[in-house]
C-alpha cells in the first residue's frame, strides 16, 4: 500500500493530535441528522403555512421515509420581547396556532420538531428584532422541552458583549465556546433529549470543542447561492474531516439542491460531497407551497438512496481529499464504508464535459471487483488500476468500489498472463518516475533456484533477484515510470502467485535547505509544530520565493509538499473567498506547476498556538523537467498577481520521490 505521504494528509502537532473529541453522547445523531429547514428559500420570513406545507411534502414525496425527518423553522419565528415571565414566545401573526401545536402537527406526521435560536441577544436576521437566548439559556431550554422540541439549531449573531453585540463579529474578543456550553448544559438538564446543532460559523476552530457540546458544528461561514461556494466549503472541510464520527458531525451547511441555483450536475456534486463527508443533510428548497414545487430532477437527487446510504453508513468515517489537480481542474475525495467498501468522488471543476480517469492507487486501492457509477447508473467489473468515465461540466463521478485489493498488490490471476516460465503483469502503477521501487515476487512453491529475472518496460535492463532462504520470495529494486501503463515480466522456474510493489521513500528537503528571495523569510514555530521541521518559510509571493538545488534522476517526479494555510474565509466568504492559497513549483526553469492548497489549520485562528499557522498538511503534485544531477527547484506564487491569492501558503519542506 502506498505510504500516507502520497495523499493529502495532515501532520499532527506534538500537542493535540486530531482524534474524536470527547462528545455529547445522549444516543442521538449516531448518523448525521437529515431534514428540512426554512432558511435557504424563505430566509428569515417563515410562517406556519409554509412549514406545514413543506412538512407534508416530506411525507408525500417519500423523503421522510428516507430519513429526512427534522423540520426546523429558522430565523424570524419569534418576537422582540419575552413574555412577562421571561419565557420565549412565537410571532402570533406568523404562527397563529403556536409552536406547541406546530410540534404536534409534525409529530403526528412522524416527523421531528426543530427550532432555531441564537447564542446572542437577538436572532440573526434582526431587525425586525427577534429575541435571542443569551442569559436565558436555562429558561429557554425548559421552554423547548415543554414544547416537545427534538432539535435546536443555535446561531451566533449579536453575541459579543465586549464589542457591543454587533450583528456579526468574526474576530470576537473571546471564544464562542462558553455560550454554546451554557445552552448545552441547559438542554442536558431537561427530561428530553434534543439534537444540538452548534452554528458558530467555523469561528475558533470548533472541531476541537463543539463535539463535547453538540451533535454537529458548522465548519465555516454560510453557504451562498453560487457554485463557487462548493469549492470554498470543501477547502474548509479538509482539516476537519478527521473529527467526524457518531454523534459529532461536521456541518457543511444546508443544501441548495432544488433551489434553482445550481445546474443538475452541480447539484449532484453538492449532494455527493455533503453526503460522503458526513455532513447533516438538510434540504433548503421549497418542496411544496402555494407558489412553488421542487422540480423532479432535483427531487431525485435528494432521494438517491445509495448516496443517502453513504451519508448514513454505520462506519461513520468521513471521506477526505486525496489528490488535487488544479490546472487540470479536478480532484478526488474518498473514504471507507462498512462492509469493506470504498466511496470515491472525482469532481470536474471545469466548464466542460469530458472524460476523467481515477487511478485507484490515489485512493489506496489497486483493484475493484465491482465499481458502481452512481450518477451514470452503470456498473463495471474487475477494474484494474484505473477507471475512466464521462462527466458533465461541474459534475462528479461518484463511485462505490467493492471487493477491493490494496494498492501495490498484484495477484497473478488478476493482473498477469503466463507462458511457460514467463509471467507478464500489466497495469502497473507508478506514482513517480524512479529506479527505486521495491518489488517482492511471491512464488507458488519453494524454489531451489537462486534467481528470478525481472524486466520492466521502464528500462531495457534485466534485473536479477535472488530467491529468499525460504525459497518462496524474491525481492529487488526496479524502475517504473509515473502513470499506470507500466508492465513487468517475471521469468522464474516456479509459477508466480503475485507481486507486491512499494514506491520509494524518497528524500526529504526541509525549508532550511532552501534560500529565500524577495519578501520570503524563514520563521521558527513553537515546539512540536510546523512538523516535521519546526520552522517554515512565509511571505511566499510573486516576488518572494524559496529556492534549492536538489540532486535527482531524470523523469517526472512526485513531490509531497508540506505546507501551512490558515487563511480562513470569513468576510470574503460572501464574495470570492476560497479558503485556499496558490502555490507554484518550477523545476529547472520549466513552466511551473500550480496547485491551490486547502486549509491546514487545526487550531483556533484567534486563540490557538500560532493561530493555526503552525499546523502542517501534505499535498502531492506531479512535476516534470527533472534531469540527472542537480536540479533548480523554486517554490513560489506565480500568477498571484493575476487573480489568484497574493500570498502562497507557508512552506515547511518537500519530499522528492
From Swiss-Prot:
Q: Which residues form a coiled coil?
A: none
Q: What is its EC number?
A: 3.2.1.22
Keyword annotations of the record: Carbohydrate metabolism, Disulfide bond, Glycoprotein, Glycosidase, Hydrolase, Polysaccharide degradation, Secreted, Signal
Where is substrate bound in this sequence? 200-204
GO CC annotation: what is one? extracellular region
Q: Which InterPro entries does the UniProt record give?
A: Aldolase_TIM, Glyco_hydro_27, Glyco_hydro_b, Glycoside_hydrolase_SF, Melibiase_C
Q: Give the disulfide map.
A: 124-157
Q: What is this protein called?
A: Probable alpha-galactosidase D
Amino acid at each position: 500500500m502506498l505510504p500516507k505521504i502520497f495523499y493529502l494528509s495532515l501532520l499532527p502537532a506534538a500537542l493535540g493530535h486530531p482524534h474524536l473529541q470527547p462528545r455529547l453522547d445522549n444516543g442521538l445523531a449516531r448518523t448525521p441528522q437529515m431534514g428540512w429547514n426554512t432558511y435557504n428559500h424563505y430566509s428569515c420570513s417563515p410562517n406556519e403555512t409554509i412549514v406545514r406545507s413543506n412538512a407534508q411534502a416530506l411525507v408525500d414525496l417519500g423523503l421522510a421515509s428516507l430519513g429526512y425527518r427534522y423540520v426546523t423553522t429558522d430565523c424570524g419565528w419569534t418576537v422582540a420581547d419575552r413574555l412577562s415571565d421571561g419565557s420565549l414566545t412565537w410571532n402570533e401573526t406568523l404562527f397563529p396556532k403556536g409552536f406547541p401545536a406546530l410540534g404536534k402537527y409534525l409529530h403526528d406526521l412522524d416527523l421531528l420538531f426543530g427550532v432555531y435560536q441564537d447564542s446572542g441577544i437577538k436572532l440573526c436576521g434582526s431587525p425586525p428584532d427577534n429575541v435571542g437566548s443569551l442569559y436565558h439559556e436555562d429558561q429557554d431550554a425548559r421552554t423547548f422541552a415543554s414544547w416537545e422540541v427534538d432539535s435546536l439549531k443555535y446561531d451566533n449573531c449579536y453575541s459579543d458583549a465586549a464589542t457591543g453585540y454587533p450583528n456579526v463579529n468574526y474576530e470576537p474578543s473571546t471564544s464562542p465556546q462558553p455560550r454554546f456550553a451554557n445552552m448545552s448544559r441547559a438542554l442536558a438538564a431537561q427530561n428530553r433529549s434534543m439534537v444540538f446543532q452548534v452554528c458558530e460559523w467555523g469561528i475558533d476552530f470548533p472541531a476541537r470543542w463543539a463535539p463535547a457540546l453538540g451533535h454537529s458544528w458548522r465548519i465555516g461561514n454560510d453557504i451562498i447561492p453560487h457554485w463557487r461556494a462548493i469549492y470554498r466549503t470543501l477547502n474548509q472541510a479538509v482539516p476537519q474531516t478527521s473529527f467526524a464520527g457518531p454523534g459529532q458531525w461536521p456541518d457543511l451547511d444546508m443544501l441548495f439542491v432544488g433551489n434553482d441555483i445550481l445546474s443538475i450536475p452541480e447539484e449532484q456534486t453538492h449532494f455527493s460531497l455533503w453526503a460522503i463527508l458526513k455532513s447533516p443533510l438538510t434540504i433548503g428548497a421549497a418542496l411544496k407551497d402555494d407558489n412553488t414545487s421542487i422540480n423532479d430532477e432535483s427531487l431525485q437527487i435528494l432521494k438517491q438512496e445509495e448516496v443517502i446510504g453513504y451519508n448514513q453508513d454505520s462506519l461513520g468515517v468521513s471521506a477526505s481529499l486525496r489528490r488535487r489537480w488544479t490546472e487540470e481542474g479536478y480532484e478526488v475525495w474518498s473514504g471507507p464504508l462498512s462492509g469493506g467498501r470504498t466511496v470515491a468522488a472525482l469532481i470536474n471543476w471545469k466548464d466542460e464535459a469530458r472524460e476523467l480517469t481515477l487511478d485507484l492507487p490515489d485512493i489506496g486501492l489497486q483493484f475493484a471487483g465491482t465499481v458502481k457509477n452512481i450518477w451514470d447508473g452503470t456498473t463495471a467489473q474487475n477494474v484494474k488500476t484505473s477507471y475512466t468515465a464521462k462527466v458533465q461540466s461541474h459534475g462528479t463521478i461518484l463511485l462505490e468500489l467493492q471487493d477491493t485489493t490494496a494498492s501495490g498488490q498484484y495477484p497473478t490471476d488478476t493482473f498477469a498472463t503466463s507462458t511457460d516460465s514467463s509471467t507478464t503483469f500489466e497495469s502497473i502503477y507508478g506514482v513517480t518516475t524512479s529506479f527505486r521501487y521495491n518489488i517482492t515476487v511471491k512464488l507458488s512453491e519453494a524454489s531451489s533456484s537462486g534467481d528470478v529475472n525481472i524486466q520492466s518496460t521502464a528500462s531495457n535492463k534485466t534485473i536479477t533477484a535472488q530467491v529468499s532462504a525460504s525459497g518462496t520470495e524474491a525481492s529487488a529494486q526496479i524502475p517504473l515510470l509515473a502513470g499506470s501503463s507500466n508492465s513487468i515480466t517475471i521469468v522464474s522456474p516456479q509459477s508466480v502467485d503475485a507481486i507486491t510493489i512499494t514506491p520509494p521513500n524518497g528524500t526529504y528537503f526541509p525549508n532550511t535547505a532552501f534560500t529565500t528571495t524577495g519578501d520570503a523569510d524563514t520563521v521558527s514555530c513553537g515546539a512540536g509544530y510546523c512538523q516535521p521541521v519546526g520552522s517554515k518559510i512565509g511571505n511566499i509571493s510573486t516576488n518572494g520565493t524559496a529556492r534549492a538545488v536538489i540532486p535527482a534522476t531524470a523523469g517526472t517526479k512526485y513531490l509531497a509538499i508540506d505546507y501551512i494555510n490558515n487563511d480562513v474565509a470569513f468576510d470574503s466568504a460572501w464574495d470570492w473567498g476560497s479558503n485556499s492559497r496558490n502555490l507554484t513549483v518550477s523545476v529547472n526553469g520549466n513552466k511551473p506547476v500550480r496547485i491551490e492548497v486547502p486549509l491546514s489549520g487545526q487550531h483556533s485562528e484567534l486563540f490557538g498556538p500560532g493561530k493555526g499557522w503552525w499546523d502542517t498538511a501534505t499535498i502531492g503534485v506531479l512535476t516534470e523537467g527533472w534531469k540527472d544531477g542537480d536540479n533548480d527547484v523554486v517554490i513560489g506564487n506565480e500568477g498571484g498577481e493575476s487573480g489568484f491569492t497574493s500570498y502562497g501558503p507557508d512552506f515547511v519542506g518537500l519530499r522528492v520521490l
